[in-house]
């Protein structure tokens, strides 16, 4: 049953032109813009560095805000003088292992150091607070803190830190819904700045894929090429909206916070950014790991119920670094083929996958390309191929892509495959990506969730079914143009003698004009 989420936090595209997030107010956007500008004027101009430094300070404030909230509750119960058993900031002194000095725990708290003089604040944050949150990884306070060991504090001027702290202080870190939207807005600024955009999949495409797959509260969801955790975060929003009452139960809430979401990446910056993105959306301890998903580090098999991903597809790997179980299925160096093989391995029976792939996966003629498509059609249940226009990833890339949706069955269960030819996604397909009226996304979701109504569609329509046997007969090609019928208008031309007569008349007019010109001007 399709869940149309219309609670104001996650409005589906059924409610209008495209998926719309309720978003943040103009006031908060202005606050974030001012924080961003403070970094730039302070000499930090690389957008991913800005995001990282902002993330560190978010974490500092989150830790203090959380403890302040716990302390307020304890005080109401008459236990204000008793130290909280799980307090991050304890009573007494913290020994800084980097400076070998003892520092009062209270000085490490946002609510304290924000009132220091600029120079005192700068020294405290740079030498003490930053080192404190780096060493929190020893206690595994959160998924985020586990990836702080190689973090670097880049703010170089006290006045820059003061401006940023003042800006962040106006944000309520305990309001996870708003903070999740704030972080999404910051990620959007990172992409809009024109650098590091390769890390960011288009959010409206991610939201479409989440709507297509309809995550369930019982799912174990993974993105083996996590990046900023876009697929996982959009899944959290869907689940929170769809299962609001069920999440009040302790067991469900625990699964949501700890066991439901997994993500892997090799870049420490992405691990920190992705973990913070999840934390700000209420997932404090996801299974986020620093690992190469295609290597022998990753031994997961038959575990996840849902995988959604946009894996890297521009590179090749040496056989030596690829997991043997993947090469046994698909002997190739191409990452896009290896990741698809990996997804099959990591899913449990009945598990589902939606992945973005380059078009070459659909029609490549190498042995590995054909073997992968054969595996999907003959040994799994391939459900849908959604072909997307090449401009979807602009301005960062112009490659044509598609979404592949399948269920792991390990048996021949593909009867027919649904194809959709997306022509518009709500934005212009040039580098500017301006918002436009044309948008196929609502139609895609509506049709995918009502496939029984697609049986009458013809190859001349924008979506249609293709029998599995026809795909086998065409070397397992999944290119939509292989099966789509293009209706061409019959063009009726005039008879040859009529056309020749026009040429003769035109030639006579040209000769007449030339003679007139010579008579007037060339005597």
Which stretches of residues belong to each language-model region?
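Non-catalytic, mostly N-terminal accessory regions of nucleic-acid modification and defense proteins
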Residues: 1-217, 286-298, 387-391, 414-428, ...
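Short, contiguous acidic/charged loop-to-helix segments that flank catalytic cores in large enzymes
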Residues: 23, 45, 318-335, 360-368, ...
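C-terminal, active-site-flanking charged/polar segments
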Residues: 381-382, 394-444
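Hydrophobic alpha-helix feature that most strongly marks membrane-spanning transmembrane helices
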Residues: 279, 312, 348-352, 362, ...
């Amino acid at each position: 049953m399709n869940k149309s989420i219309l609670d104001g936090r996650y409005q589906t595209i059924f409610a209008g032109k495209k998926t719309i997030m309720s978003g943040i107010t103009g006031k908060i956007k202005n606050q974030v813009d001012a924080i961003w500008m403070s970094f730039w004027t302070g000499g930090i101009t690389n957008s991913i560095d800005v995001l990282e430094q902002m993330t560190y300070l978010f974490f500092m404030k989150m830790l203090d805000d959380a403890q302040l909230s716990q302390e307020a509750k304890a005080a109401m119960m008459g236990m204000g003088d008793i130290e909280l058993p799980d307090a991050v900031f304890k009573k007494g002194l913290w020994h800084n292992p980097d400076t070998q000095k003892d520092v009062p725990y209270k000085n490490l708290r946002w609510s304290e150091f924000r009132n220091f003089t600029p120079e005192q604040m700068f020294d405290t944050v740079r030498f003490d607070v930053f080192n404190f949150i780096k060493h929190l990884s020893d206690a595994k306070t959160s998924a985020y803190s586990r990836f702080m060991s190689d973090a670097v504090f880049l703010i170089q001027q006290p006045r820059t830190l003061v401006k940023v702290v003042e800006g962040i202080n106006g944000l309520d870190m305990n309001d996870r819904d708003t903070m999740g939207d704030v972080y999404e807005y910051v990620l959007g600024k990172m992409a809009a700045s024109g650098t590091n955009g390769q890390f960011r999949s288009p959010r409206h495409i991610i939201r479409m894929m989440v709507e297509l797959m309809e995550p369930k509260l019982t799912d174990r969801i993974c993105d083996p090429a996590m990046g900023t955790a876009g697929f996982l975060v959009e899944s959290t929003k869907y689940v929170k909206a769809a299962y609001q009452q069920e999440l009040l139960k302790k067991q469900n809430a625990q699964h949501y916070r700890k066991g439901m979401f997994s993500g892997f990446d090799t870049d420490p910056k992405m691990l920190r950014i992705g973990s913070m993105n999840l934390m700000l959306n209420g997932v404090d301890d996801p299974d986020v790991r620093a690992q190469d998903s295609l290597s022998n580090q990753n031994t997961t098999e038959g575990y996840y119920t849902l995988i959604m991903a946009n894996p890297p597809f521009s590179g090749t790997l040496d056989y030596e670094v690829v997991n043997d179980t993947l090469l046994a299925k698909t002997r190739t160096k191409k990452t896009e083929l290896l990741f698809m093989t990996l997804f099959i391995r990591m899913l449990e029976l009945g598990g589902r996958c939606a992945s973005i792939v380059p078009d070459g996966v659909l029609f490549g003629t190498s042995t590995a390309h054909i073997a992968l498509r054969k595996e999907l059609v003959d040994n799994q249940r391939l459900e849908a191929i959604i072909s997307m226009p090449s401009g979807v990833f602009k301005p960062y890339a112009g490659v044509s892509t598609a979404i592949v949706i399948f269920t792991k069955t390990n048996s021949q269960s593909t009867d027919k495959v649904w194809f959709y030819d997306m022509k518009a996604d709500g934005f212009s397909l040039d580098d500017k990506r301006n918002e436009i009226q044309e948008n196929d996304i609502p139609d895609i979701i509506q049709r995918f969730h009502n496939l029984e109504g697609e049986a009458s569609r013809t190859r001349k329509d924008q979506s249609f079914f293709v029998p599995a046997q026809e795909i086998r007969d065409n070397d397992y090609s999944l290119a939509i143009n292989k099966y789509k019928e293009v209706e061409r208008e019959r063009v009726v031309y005039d008879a040859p003698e009529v056309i020749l007569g026009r040429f003769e008349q035109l030639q006579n007019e040209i000769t007449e004009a030339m003679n007139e010109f010579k008579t007037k001007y060339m005597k």
